[in-house]
Amino acid sequence: VAEGLPMTISAQTDPHQHPHSSANPPPIAPELAALDKKLGKLVVNRFTYRLLRLLGRFVRPPFDPAGVSLEYDHSGGERIAIITPETRRGDGALILFHGGGFVFGRPEDIFPKAAMFAKALGVPVICPAYRLAPQAPFPAALNDGHAAWHRVLARAEALGIDPAKIVIGGYSAGGGLAANLVHRLHDEGGPQPAAQLLIYPMLDDRTAQRRDLDTPRHSIWSNANNRFAWPAYLGGKRDAQALPYAAAARRADLSGLPPAWVGVGSCDLFLDEVRDYAARLAEAGVAVSYEEVAGGIHAFDMDANPLASAFTALQVDFTRYHVA
């Protein structure tokens, strides 16, 4: 591992050494009360997911294009949005996948984040669209992410990107997609991502099967939502055990993967699976930077707040090291 790479993994990644877990979350941080009140009771099921998709077409986070340019690539498959900073300071790039439980969401949802990364890092940020379940179950999203990776490689010279300096990341389901894409690229050989940025990633279908997670309140993404999303993504399959690259936590051998930044809030439904995955990466010899935010709910960084600012700053620092 190159000198200077952040290699911090907290003892909190061991569920047995920490008082809080997905089944026993701490109080929500006071700074997140407004966000929790606004979106905490989000319901995602077979009736609402279509409405969420429709709303996503018309209600988007405010995107300020100052300091960046936006280009869409429709050359093949799903569209890819490329956000390039006016001032380039590196020849790497960040591929960033949106969230939405694999059943809703659009690249435009993360444009504000992508623009922030582009300006902070001085490199292009690529936001690929991917097909959504249940209409397009696994492996559709993975295949779209895989195609996006190769489309970026094909355009790397024209975009001023060094193929050896591309970080793959994502939020929630997009983080799970990023982790699975990293697995697939590792197994296929060929050009590899420089690092992976896993932001409260959706990694383990077995979480949805845990009935002990039905009682605790998990803001924004509940296990009821999870219990709809995973079967939808898996195409009605009972679990992901026999589906390689569907649920990243199912992978037995994590050795040889690129350095990872992994972050989650301590009130997130995904806490146990994310904490365990980070610990397993470290045990497999992968350089891991793990951040667990006390009182953080799922997607707590979607609104401006002090916890989000600190959380995002760590992501920028990690990514900068690999794209500079």
PLM-predicted stretches and their roles:
Residues 305-324:
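Catalytic active-site module of serine/aspartate enzymes centered on a nucleophile-bearing elbow/loop
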Residues 262-264:
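Short beta-strand/loop motif that positions the catalytic acidic residue
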Residues 2-86, 306:
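A glycine/proline-hinged amphipathic helix-loop "lid/cap" segment
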Residues 296-307:
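Catalytic histidine-centered segment of alpha/beta-hydrolase-like enzymes
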Residues 183-240:
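Hydrolase active-site cap/lid region
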Residues 153-167:
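Gly/Ser-rich "nucleophile elbow"/oxyanion-hole loop immediately N-terminal to the catalytic nucleophile
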Residues 108-126:
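Short amphipathic alpha-helix adjacent to the substrate-entry channel of hydrolases
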